[in-house]
Amino acid sequence: LRGPSFTVSTACASSNHAMAQAFAIVRSGMSPVMVTGGSESMLCFGGVKAWEGLRVMSRDACRPFSANRNGMVQGEGAGVFVFEEYEHACARGAEVLCEVAGFAMTSDASDIVMPSKAGAARAMQGALQDAGINREEVGYINAHGTGTAANDKTECAAVADVFGTHADQLMISSTKSMHGHVIGGTGA
């Protein structure tokens, strides 16, 4: 491992931003392969108390987009991906599992637990534009879906703004119901 190496620290977006940067480096030709991902372990007294202080923690389970949701649950975990230029992967006989077509990054510094619809919409619109695909080509969204009323409602409104009538055809879920909110490792 001798290519670009750096750490990204942007809260819940850290691993997504790290993967976007790895994708951009491969796409630019700076490196044919990048290893990227994210991890987080905040299941300690201070970490739990900090989120409890924000009053966003569930008493029992994380249920993103459910009428019975009552907050998030912390988790810990990690994920690592290999981003590789397609011809380079084929030349070495690698099994290509998926393709990343595009990405976007935005900033939404208004509130840590009350995201803005505009910020989420800009990110989705930018990703569609960068990928060069129409919104009707999207069939599934793995949403941030924290299980808090504020986040879930805002995300749904942003999806409706970006995808219009196609939003009714989309499958949307959040894996946080299975592993909790992994903070910086969430995207990986």
What are these model-predicted stretches?
Residues A18, A123-A131, A158, V162:
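Stable alpha-helical structural segments in soluble proteins, enriched in small hydrophobic residues
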Residues T10-S14, G38-L43, G102-S107, G145-G147, ...:
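Acidic, glycine-rich active-site loops and adjacent beta-strand->loop/helix elements
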Residues I25-S28, V48-R59, A118-R122, T154-H166:
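A glycine- and small-aliphatic-rich helix-loop capping segment at beta-alpha/alpha-beta transitions
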Residues A109-A120, T146-F163, V182-A188:
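Short glycine/threonine-rich loop-to-helix capping motif typified by GTGT followed
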Residues G3-A11, S66-N70, L170-V182:
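Short pre-catalytic strand/loop immediately N-terminal to key active-site residues, enriched for Gly-Thr
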Residues S5-G37, Q74-A94, H181-A188:
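Active-site-proximal alpha-helical scaffold in enzymes
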Residues S15, A22, W51, V82, ...:
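Conserved small-residue
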Residues M57, A61-I133, E137-Y140:
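Condensing-enzyme catalytic core mediating Claisen C-C bond formation in acyl metabolism
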